[in-house]
Amino acid sequence: MKRTSRSLTAALLGIAALLAGCIKPNTFDPYANPGRGELDRRQKIVNGRPDLETVQQQLANLDATIRAMIAKYSPQTRFSTGVTVSHLTNGCNDPFTRTIGRQEASELFFGRPAPTPQQWLQIVTELAPVFKAAGFRPNNSVPGDPPQPLGAPNYSQIRDDGVTINLVNGDNRGPLGYSYNTGCHLPAAWRTAPPPLNMRPANDPDVHYPYLYGSPGGRTRDAY
């Protein structure tokens, strides 16, 4: 009996040790700090993206094009601001909440009355090559499924650097909805000098580019 008990205890300890090696810091709490190695991986992703100012200019140009196409094919549609969003001055959305970077979102715009299905098809047909040239792909289906056909109400877009454009047509009961988001990027100045003091982690005021825990460094304190 004692031998069986010892064998069971040893087996349980073995399983516990195996699990300990596999469990990540945020396995049970998705909001927990995932560890320095994972944070460095995420920071390197952001460091490799275009500067925030570059993305802002690209989105400003695309915004003008989107509005021009809607005005061309659906002149009855008028835009208004429906929802004012809070603009992040520092920090990014999940999974980059502990990453050094900035993320900005537009207001949520509504177009009334919405383009007709025929007008909408003309609009997205002209926008398709524009989005493709800017590096976007459709973001209107669940992962693993093909994009919805051209002319479907949802013509939202996403790019590999995290930039998103939400563009969804309405109908005779609801307006067109439109907004965009830069995703997490570094301002150009943060590559040559630290962020302003009030935008640095409170417990790590001496951060500097490339903002890594590992070599070549830039962070020394665990992120909250």
Curated annotation (Swiss-Prot):
In terms of Gene3D superfamilies, this protein maps to: 3.30.2030.20
Where does the signal peptide begin and end? 1-21
Please give the sites of covalent lipid attachment annotated as S-diacylglycerol cysteine. Answer: 22
Q: Which UniProt keywords apply?
A: Cell membrane, Lipoprotein, Membrane, Palmitate, Signal
Q: Name one GO cellular component term.
A: plasma membrane
Q: Which domain of life is it from?
A: Bacteria
Compartments (UniProt record): Cell membrane
What Pfam families does UniProt report for this protein, alphabetically? LppA
Q: Where is the lipid attached (N-palmitoyl cysteine)?
A: 22
Q: How does it sit in the membrane?
A: Lipid-anchor
Q: Member of which family?
A: To M.tuberculosis LprP.
Supply the name of the protein. Uncharacterized lipoprotein LprP
Which organism is this protein's natural source? Mycobacterium bovis (strain ATCC BAA-935 / AF2122/97)
Report the gene name.
lprP
